Amino acid sequence: HTDLTGIFVPEHGLFGAVAAGDDVDGAEYKGVKVYSLYGAARRPTPAMLDSIDVMTVDIQDVGARHYTYVSTMAYAMEECAKAGKKFVVFDRPNPIGGLMEGPLLRQEQTSFIGLYPVPLRHGLTIGEYARYINDTQKLGLDLTVIPMKGWQRKMYWQDTGLPWVGTSPQIPTAATALYLSLIHI
């Protein structure tokens, strides 16, 4: 038996419709409390985590280092590790494939739009990135990655046969995810 006690949302909100940089207000969705992790709180607080046993992440990253969804996940992982909460990631395809390219982020440049020394086009799935964070940051998080089926590193989104759901107003198509990985902001 599972009870959904809270929904934690990243920069672009629950449905990916909030513009970049805009505040994401917490509210309720179908009677469940929604907590914004973009704005005043970028990390779940102990009070937010009190009512949960496990945090699940089912979010589509775009494969570019400066897209903030990985940072939001990383901060949630850190706080769940401190609080002794389990963490489950539902893996998803990297829409721009498994190729890594571009410069590595230098330590002095780290920020919310780039926390780790990975290439601009990082080539990882969200599940692989979660494992990378847990291992390299030595979080000791009770992490489970639910694997996906059928994706191969050479595949782009259009090769998956899956419908694309825009992750933000700036990424309405899978092709725009590739363009984002080609620029450095």
Locate predicted features:
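A short helix->loop->beta-strand "cap" motif at the edges of active sites that frequently abuts
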Residues: 2, 82-86
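Short internal beta-strands
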Residues: 5-11
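Glycine-rich oxoanion-binding loops at beta->alpha junctions
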Residues: 24-51, 64
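Conserved anion/nucleotide-ligand pocket segment
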Residues: 110-180
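N-terminal beta-loop-helix "entrance" segment that forms/cooperates
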Residues: 12-29
